[in-house]
Design a protein with these regions (language model features):
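N-terminal nucleic-acid-engaging modules of covalent nucleotidyltransferase systems
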Residues: 1-237
């Protein structure tokens, strides 16, 4: 799938105020991506990439591309020929570079991609890199769109994502294999669970009614972590 298709949908979503309209636009794009996969035109992994990019994140946690590189960009191109895989491949190669000269190599690699991007595509990619993509499509909106595109109950999608912490993976599986695949997503030792915050209550009385007797302490600064143990293997997530 072309990056331009995702960027166009993102830009349309960014000017929409209606949540339902945003969901509909994203679901339509994911459905079109699934049709391309079914026809053998693109690999199934592009569904996951489209989902991830519309939710505002890259697959690579760190690319190593320095922000200073982003201030020396060539003029925008006509664009329209860069695919989702093209973008992911550049980011993956950048993330794997190390050693002497790697910063310069990353910059050259990234600039090679940028020279092929239109102004709209460039703004989208820079937003992903900076982690500040403003398009009005929070993960909850994208998750609802995934459920709509895949014809699955939203609660089933939420449960699958919560157990695996992987919305793109759930999206790809659902749109390729159908709603029945969601039962395969279960809690797995060593894999982080998404919801790390307790659900809210309207009042203290309501909270205590749900939990029963409780001890309450002042909240201290610290970190929130999950500890997974399987035999002698212990992971802190």
């Amino acid at each position: 799938m072309l990056l331009a298709d995702v960027v166009r949908t993102s830009n349309q979503v960014s000017v929409m105020s209606s949540r339902n309209a945003k969901v509909s636009l994203i679901a339509d794009l994911l459905h079109r991506c699934a049709l391309l996969v079914a026809d053998g035109a693109v690999p199934a992994a592009e569904i996951g990439l489209a989902t991830r990019y519309l939710a505002g994140s890259l697959r690579q946690r760190r690319t190593g591309i320095e922000l200073s590189t982003l201030s020396r960009l060539p003029a925008p191109a006509v664009g329209g020929d860069v695919t989702l895989f093209d973008l992911d491949a550049v980011m993956q190669r950048a993330s794997e570079m190390a050693g002497a000269g790697s910063s310069r190599a990353r910059a050259e690699l990234f600039l090679g991609l940028v020279r092929r991007l239109s102004a709209e595509e460039r703004a989208f990619v820079l937003g992903l890199l900076r982690g500040g993509l403003r398009q009005g499509a929070l993960e909850s909106v994208v998750m609802t769109a995934v459920a709509d595109a895949g014809g699955a109950p939203l609660d089933d999608v939420r449960r699958a994502v919560a157990s695996q912490g992987d919305l793109p993976g759930v999206s790809q599986a659902l749109l390729v294999d159908g709603p029945g695949v969601l039962v395969l997503f279960r809690l797995t030792v060593g894999r982080g669970v998404s919801p790390m915050l307790a659900s809210s209550a309207k009042s203290l009385a309501e909270a205590l009614a749900k939990t029963g007797p409780a001890a309450v302490e002042w909240k201290l600064d610290g970190i929130r972590a999950q500890i997974h143990k399987q035999g002698n293997d212990i992971r802190v997530l």
